Amino acid sequence: MIDAPARFRIGELARRVGTTPRAVRYYEELGLLPGHERSDGGHRVYDERDEQRLRDLLHIRTLLGLSLTELREWMDAEDARARLRERWQDLPSEDDTARGEIIREGLDHLATQLALVRTRLSDLERLEDDLADKRRRLRSMLADMEHPA
């Protein structure tokens, strides 16, 4: 016997991923979390795919500090790559032309994501440089105070 997929309401989904029901609804409104089913009682019902997508979304937003626009770019690229993987599975192995097209499209989507990561890395490097400069100035001030000329 095959177990039915786990299904849960919005509060349970929010609890499982460490956010609030309001945040879940907000991500739905923005289109970052796909539409949901409704129970007979009219409650939103989610499954493990929704849970994983929300975990991924929250993880990448926290990790990279993306704006909602950037987060949409990231998730759009993820979704496009998932569709490409499905197309790949449906292709005959000898169809190199179509496979090459899929690979090129996948590379484009990865380039979008890499650009977002590189922007964040650049921002972090500037912040690191600023903090290191402040630390050098404070150490210099302290040294001057401890050992006046």
Annotate each predicted stretch with a short phrase.
Residues 1-9, 15, 48-149:
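Arg/Lys-rich, alpha-helical DNA-contact motif
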Residues 14, 28:
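The alpha-helix within a helix-turn-helix
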Residues 21-23:
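The DNA-contacting recognition helix of HTH DNA-binding domains
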Residues 25, 32:
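N-terminal G-site helix/loop of the GST-like fold
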Residues 27, 40, 74:
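Residue-level "edge-of-site" marker
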Residues 34-41:
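Beta-hairpin "wing" of winged helix-turn-helix
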Residues 41-48:
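Minor-groove-contacting beta-hairpin "wing" of winged helix-turn-helix DNA-binding domains
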